[in-house]
Amino acid sequence: MVNDIIADSLTRLRNASMRRLEFTQLYYAKIVVSILEIFKEKGFIKDFNIKDKDKKQSVYVQLAYDEKGYSKISEVKRLSKPGRRVYKQKNELKRFKNGYGVIVVSTSKGVITNEEAYRQNVGGEVLCSIW
């Protein structure tokens, strides 16, 4: 059993993009699906599908690459960890990497990006960053 499903998922995405794989498989969790929806919306992944196999669900992710074959994921980091939670207020969630990167924040209004959290005037737990 994986202790930190978000860190495991981000590591699998990072490893698959470095190896230039087209697809990768992640463990299913609602929080992982919420993060993947943000990644898809921002163009870091092409698509993802949830599949059932022997009463266990998996998420299959199709990675996105540019026309030269480079991955759209340059770096992905887990910021808040089970042993050390990181929380930020609204005014600490401004632009990241001059708008090229995204910070994923878990708020009372759901899992959203740092820019949406700033617009909605909410803070929360900083889950991960990607650029």
Curated annotation (Swiss-Prot):
HAMAP family from the UniProt entry: Ribosomal_uS8_B
One Gene Ontology term from the biological process aspect of the record: translation
Protein name (record): Small ribosomal subunit protein uS8
Species this chain originates from: Helicobacter acinonychis (strain Sheeba)
Subunit and partners: Part of the 30S ribosomal subunit. Contacts proteins S5 and S12.
Role played: One of the primary rRNA binding proteins, it binds directly to 16S rRNA central domain where it helps coordinate assembly of the platform of the 30S subunit.
GO CC field: ribonucleoprotein complex; ribosome
Alphabetical list of InterPro entries matching this protein: Ribosomal_uS8, Ribosomal_uS8_CS, Ribosomal_uS8_sf
A GO MF label: rRNA binding
Family the entry assigns: Belongs to the universal ribosomal protein uS8 family.
Signal sequence extent: none
